[in-house]
Amino acid sequence: KTAATAAAAGAVAPYVVTGFPAVHAADPVTLRIAGTGVNAFNELAQKAKEDLGFNIQYITLTSDDVVKRAVTQPNSFDMLDSEYWMLAKIVPSGNLLGMDAKKIKAYDKIVPIFTKGTLPNGKAMSRQGTAPIKVAYLEEQKSKKFAAEPSQWMTVLPTVYNADTLGIRPDLSKRPITTWADLLSSEFKGKSAILNIPSIGIMDAAMVCEAMGEVKYGDKGNMTKEEIDKTIAVLTQAKKDGQFRAFWKEFNESVNLMASGEVVIQSMWSPAVTAVRQRGVPCVYQPLKEGYRAWASGLGLPSHLSGKQLDAAYEFINWYLSGWA
């Protein structure tokens, strides 16, 4: 899921780095970071090497494969770039090491969405879906359970967050798009697309079904069997009716579908909208009256990490929050 344009979760005063490059040059360290590639920037790796003296190696995977790798091959990476929805699948494996909040220099400056479950103005955040605060902390450093209240042990250090909506081709839609329900409007039969990453796409589907008045959810992130059945029934019928041009799973698929005009309205991520515009094609990330589907990601530590690798991971995390990234 992508957000090169997402806001940094902890922009703080510059982090002064002294002496580290020389130390690590004598005893080379490489941190292998597994993730979707959303935050895998070569410029970031180069700057980290200049400032910290060790190598960053990205392992780019699909969202589903990030979860599979974290659960089945935790020794194959040194840091995990995980989206928050993935944590409910990963933490029960015991493969995630609680991150010591006391070692995070800018901990007190992290946006309270992640540390208190509130907006900066103190207003409580929605608890629907995978609200970050519900999966932000572990009971202990080595635990398979989330803490009910903030603890010393963080699951991941939040790095980026954003809110997704529908992308549209305003030159082809022929009318204003105002609601999630428009994704299944008969006007766009054969010209709509939805995200085919189940844990995310089902939330887009829920936004659509509720906007249509087909389903009223108690909690979209913890649906009842009846709610699931109703949601799937709506999608199945739409597919039978030929509503969907495609079900996309990868960033570039969504860009190509929209840029080519094969799709007029679809689930989309903000950098994909930018990529379409860069081709000279009009594309709008459309605000909708029901609101957005929010998401976030962060850096976590696999349970096997220790010694200089663990020390380097904390150095990188503190550097990441220092402002340059």
Each language-model region and where it sits:
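Short beta-strand-to-loop elements that line the ligand-binding cleft
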Residues: 55-62, 81, 223, 242-251, ...
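Alpha-to-beta junction loops
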Residues: 54, 73-81, 95-97, 188-191, ...
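N-terminal export signals
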Residues: 1-19
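Extracytoplasmic/periplasmic substrate-binding proteins
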Residues: 243-305
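A bilobed periplasmic-binding-protein/Venus flytrap-type ligand-binding module shared by bacterial periplasmic
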Residues: 165-172, 208, 296-309
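Early extracytoplasmic/lumenal segment of secretory-pathway proteins
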Residues: 26-93, 255
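Bilobed periplasmic-binding protein/Venus flytrap-like ligand-binding cleft at the lobe interface
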Residues: 179-188, 298-325
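Extracytoplasmic ligand-binding site segments that recognize negatively charged/polar headgroups
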Residues: 39-42, 91-253
